[in-house]
């Protein structure tokens, strides 16, 4: 399995392209947000001779879904995400405006990761593990020693993780 991380959009979201020796690829958390970023992702796919077969998301926040509609149109691939996060797609424009990020067309979900135990492509299997917290439909995708976790560590929020309680424990304060 090979993995590439591309960072997109003003929020600096990480998009992962995962593929194996069959050249079949899954794009995880497609955050490409404009024609320049769409082209960067398309060029990466072309330069590596990849055949995208699925766009999959760890959760439904706008910064992780901005590029999914492009992938669905360009490559004719389905989109997999928990339907528990579908409401976030409906509210993406409002969420984006809060962060000053224009949000275009949001995709429809083709495969519900709540009822999908694994994603298979080429010779690769990604196990789908449900991790609600950051969003109601949050999932992580596990393959061997690699875990694609999106924003799972941000339970109920986004941004830096606070280690205040750890510092207090370490110092006895």
How would you describe each model-predicted region?
Residues 26-29, 54-57, 128-130:
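Short catalytic-loop micro-motif centered on adjacent basic/acidic residues
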Residues 117, 124, 145-146, 152, ...:
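Well-ordered beta-strand scaffold positions
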Residues 88-91, 156-162:
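A short acidic, helix-capping loop that chelates divalent metal ions and anchors anionic groups
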Residues 3, 17, 116-142:
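Core dinuclear metal-dependent hydrolase active-site scaffold
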Residues 30-32, 60, 134-135, 145-146, ...:
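Active-site metal-binding loops of divalent metal-dependent hydrolases
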Residues 164-171:
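Conserved small/polar residues in nucleotide/adenosyl-binding loops
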Residues 1-48, 140-150:
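Conserved beta-strand hairpin/beta-sheet module of binuclear metal-dependent hydrolase folds
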Residues 32-38, 42-121:
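Active-site HxH/HxHxD metal-binding segment of metal-dependent hydrolases
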